[in-house]
Design a protein with these regions (language model features):
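Membrane-cytosol interface segments
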Residues: 1-53
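Phosphate/pyrophosphate-binding loop motifs in nucleotide- or prenyl diphosphate-using proteins
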Residues: 31, 39-227
């Protein structure tokens, strides 16, 4: 079997408190799947070392086998694939794909979009491992600097707000698709990380999601100003 990143994520197991992935003889990993395991520091073990383990559900019940309609909420817990946090991760997968296409569209975008891509991948890690999102600059800008530029682009780039159209170059269209994907991920994040009263449970993740879509808009502004 050839495992891609989604297959791998669905089959990560917990072994003595650590996340592992069992790979059977003859099975292979795509480069994306191997990068994911390396990035998340998930050890690859031969399938012979796998032993019967029970999967824990959110309601406290246990299962001996993982049902196809369920996946790991974290290294310990299984939940249905329509859980809000799982849906959020799916939106983030789409965003990652769109960001990579932006990098391929123009070499000059490789570095700034790469920073946004790195942040997107960090957010998934912070969700899965319940880690805080570190504060920092994005594409050289603090949150306040980014906010001022996105509100008043004319003052900083000589380019007012605009709506992308068929007359724009392909790079702007690519960036706009990625911006839309970032917005969809942000909306999914609000569903996943707000309690019943609407209070954010992960304001750091929600703040970072907003910064990503805003930064992609600034990159669109910069590209538009070059015309």
């Amino acid at each position: 079997m050839l495992y891609n990143q989604e297959n791998v994520r669905d089959n990560v197991r917990n072994r003595e408190g650590k996340r592992v992935f069992y790979l059977a003889k003859g099975d292979q990993l795509t480069s994306g799947a191997r990068d994911f395991l390396s990035r998340e520091r998930i050890e690859i073990l031969p399938a012979e070392l796998a032993r019967a383990e029970s999967y824990r559900l959110l309601n406290g019940a246990s299962l001996e086998e993982k049902p196809e309609h369920m996946t790991h909420l974290d290294a310990q817990i299984l939940d249905p694939k329509n859980h809000p946090r799982i849906l959020f991760r799916g939106k983030m997968d789409t965003l990652e794909a769109e960001l990579i296409l932006c990098q391929l569209a123009a070499e000059r975008l490789a570095a700034p979009v790469g920073e946004i891509l790195a942040l997107a991948r960090r957010l998934i890690r912070c969700d899965v491992l319940n880690e805080p999102v570190p504060e920092g600059k994005l594409c050289g800008l603090t949150g306040d600097e980014q906010r001022r530029r996105s509100h008043f682009p004319q003052d900083y780039y000589g380019q007012p707000h605009f709506m992308p159209g068929v007359g724009d170059v392909d790079v702007i269209a690519r960036l706009n698709r990625a911006r839309c994907a970032a917005r969809e991920a942000e909306l999914a994040g609000v569903t996943a990380f707000c309690d019943r009263e609407g209070n954010p449970t992960r304001p750091d993740i929600l703040r970072s999601l907003n910064r990503m879509s805003s930064m992609l808009y600034l990159l669109m502004i910069q590209e538009k100003s070059k015309k």
